[in-house]
Amino acid sequence: MKVILIKDTKDGKANTIIDVSPGYATNFLFKNKLAEPLNARTEKLLVKRKQQIEIEKQEKQEQIAKLKIEIEKLVLWFKLKGNKESVHGAITAKKIKKELEIKGIFVDKQAIQTSGISTFGTSFVDIKLSSQTIAKLKINITKDE
C-alpha cells in the first residue's frame, strides 16, 4: 500500500511517498496521523505542499542574503581598558550580540563564532547565518582612556 508521510518517521521523511504493508499503514501510520493514503486528492496536496516548502526555502535564502549584506556593511566599535601591550577584558559573543540588537539585527549568540577578541585594532568575526552562509562582521577595538 502506498502512503504519503505527513511527519518524519523511521520509514522516511515527511512529504514522501513510501510503500508499506496495509496492516502497518492502518494500525500505526494512519492511527498516529503519521501518513495518509495515496490517492489523486492527496497526491495533488503533496505537490502543493512541496511547492510551498520550496517557496518558503527561497524566501528564507533571500532574507539570509539580505541580512549578510547588512552585517557586512556594519562596523562595530568597542572600547577596552588597557595599555599598549595588554588588554583588560575581551569582546565576547554576548557583547557583539547586544550591539547588533541595538543596531536592529537579531542573530543567535551561538551563530557568532568567536572565543573573545582581546586585541586593539580591527578584527573580523564570522557569523553563521545558515549552513552555507557566513557573514564577516568588522569590529574595531580602541583603548578606553
Swiss-Prot record:
GO CC annotations, alphabetized: ribonucleoprotein complex; ribosome
GO function terms (MF aspect): rRNA binding; structural constituent of ribosome
GO biological process terms, semicolon-separated: translation
PROSITE patterns: RIBOSOMAL_L9
UniProt keyword annotation of RNA-binding present: yes
Domain of life of the source: Bacteria
Alphabetic keyword roster: Ribonucleoprotein, Ribosomal protein, RNA-binding, rRNA-binding
InterPro entries found in the cross-reference section: Ribosomal_bL9, Ribosomal_bL9/RNase_H1_N, Ribosomal_bL9_bac/chp, Ribosomal_bL9_C, Ribosomal_bL9_C_sf, Ribosomal_bL9_N, Ribosomal_bL9_N_sf
General function of this protein: Binds to the 23S rRNA.
UniProt xrefs under PANTHER family: 50S RIBOSOMAL PROTEIN L9 (PTHR21368)
Protein name stated in the entry: Large ribosomal subunit protein bL9
